[in-house]
């Protein structure tokens, strides 16, 4: 039960809590699991159904002011609450893997619901692009007439809105029209590349605005003077821009798009770093690797060991490599079927693009795929 020990030990932080979880989890003598299959019928499977948090730690307390400042003053109860919160999230992830094992798929929206959401999002994107083009033209006129750096900066902001829409459209179009012979694994890497290009353009324009603003502070000339009529036009245009933006916010607030959430919640610097990490092959979190290990171990009773579980970014999704150990006398046909099924399960997870399941009969050999070509 090498994999069982690895998964159960990962649920604790080196405290006694994790050691107490292991015996109950491995015995599998509990009731029926969440997928509708009784754990007693398959005692070789890991089973965490009987584990529940104490009532005193059901909810994590709200974050206090000192937590937002960086946790300079730490309360003794915060660590305990955070620990149980992580345990709860880990158990929820295991339950999700049990559902995938028992049903063969994860519950989600129907095809009709997905099409309805796609149509609504497409309409919102079209309206946003049309509004941005109108606003950009109006801001260009206001910038030429006024010469105000504030209005020019707002004009560049509208230009960036149009550019971001074009980049998103181009990346989506490229992913759908990729040639399977020239690009065997598709063009999913176009998304992080497009975001990096957009971030570079935005940083360049922002830096140029800062330089021009600094230069104008030391310029004593009085070049740009507006008449009353020109001021009225400029103010009306900027008020119209603000009104249209507010209407778009109200209309689009119901769409919980992850890309838009990243743009609004995280800073652009964090977004750039995130996409850089996705291109260089950063490993998945330990909690996610535990979920994958749990899924592979509970796949089939013939699995003797799980030698390796890797998940690393290759674009916006994960590539997964799993090495499982089967009996050395197992027929090839049976071993192939056992190895193919977890690959299909792994690739059905929304975060995973490709999964590779390797079969072996022992786990004492040297690590495979030695880096013999590395020169550093």
Curated annotation (Swiss-Prot):
InterPro entries, alphabetized: Cation_efflux, Cation_efflux_CTD, Cation_efflux_CTD_sf, Cation_efflux_TMD_sf, CDF_Transporter
Subcellular location: Vacuole membrane
Domain of life: Eukaryota
Keywords: Ion transport, Membrane, Transmembrane, Transmembrane helix, Transport, Vacuole
Chain segments carrying region Disordered: 1-28
Vacuolar side: 145-149, 213-231
GO MF annotation list: manganese:proton antiporter activity
GO annotations of cellular component type: membrane; vacuolar membrane
Membrane topology type: Multi-pass membrane protein
Gene3D superfamilies noted in UniProt: Cation efflux protein transmembrane domain, Cation efflux protein, cytoplasmic domain
Cytoplasmic compartment residues: 1-123, 171-191, 253-376
TM region(s), chain numbering: 124-144, 150-170, 192-212, 232-252
Similarity comment: family membership: Belongs to the cation diffusion facilitator (CDF) transporter (TC 2.A.4) family. SLC30A subfamily.
Chain's role: Involved in sequestration of excess metal in the cytoplasm into vacuoles to maintain metal homeostasis.
Protein name in UniProt: Metal tolerance protein 6
Gene encoding the protein: MTP6
């Amino acid at each position: 039960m090498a994999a069982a020990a690895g998964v159960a030990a990962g649920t604790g932080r080196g405290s006694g809590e994790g050691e107490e979880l292991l015996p109950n989890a491995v015995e599998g003598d509990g009731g029926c699991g969440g997928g509708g299959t009784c754990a007693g019928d398959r005692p070789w499977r890991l089973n965490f159904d009987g584990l529940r948090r104490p009532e005193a730690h059901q909810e994590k307390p709200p974050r206090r002011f000192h937590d937002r400042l960086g946790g300079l003053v730490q309360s003794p109860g915060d660590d305990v609450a955070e620990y149980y919160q992580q345990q709860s999230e880990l158990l929820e992830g295991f339950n999700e893997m049990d559902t995938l094992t028992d049903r063969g798929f994860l519950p989600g929206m129907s095809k009709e619901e997905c099409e309805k959401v796609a149509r609504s999002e497409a309409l919102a994107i079209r309206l946003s692009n049309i509004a941005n083009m109108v606003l950009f033209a109006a801001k260009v006129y206001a910038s030429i007439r006024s010469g105000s750096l504030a209005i020019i900066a707002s004009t560049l902001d509208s230009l960036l809105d149009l550019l971001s829409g074009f980049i998103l459209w181009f990346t989506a179009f490229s992913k759908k029209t990729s040639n399977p012979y020239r690009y065997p694994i598709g063009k999913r890497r176009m998304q992080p590349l497009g975001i990096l290009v957009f971030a570079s353009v935005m940083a360049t324009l922002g830096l140029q605005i800062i330089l021009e603003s600094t230069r104008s502070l030391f310029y004593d000339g009085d070049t740009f003077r507006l008449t009353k009529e020109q001021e009225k036009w400029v103010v009306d245009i900027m008020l119209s821009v603000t009104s249209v933006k507010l209407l778009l916010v109200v209309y689009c607030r119901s769409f919980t798009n992850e890309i838009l959430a990243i743009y609004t919640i995280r800073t652009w610097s964090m977004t750039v770093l995130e996409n850089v990490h996705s291109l260089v092959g950063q490993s998945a979190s330990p909690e996610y690797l535990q979920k994958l290990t749990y899924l592979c171990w509970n796949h089939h009773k013939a699995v003797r060991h799980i030698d390796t579980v890797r998940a690393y970014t290759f674009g916006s999704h994960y590539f997964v490599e799993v090495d499982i150990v089967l009996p050395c006398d197992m027929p090839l046909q049976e071993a192939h079927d056992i190895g193919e099924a977890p690959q299909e399960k792994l690739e059905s997870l929304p975060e995973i693009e490709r999964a590779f399941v390797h079969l072996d009969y022992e786990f004492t050999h040297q690590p495979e795929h030695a880096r013999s070509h590395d020169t550093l």
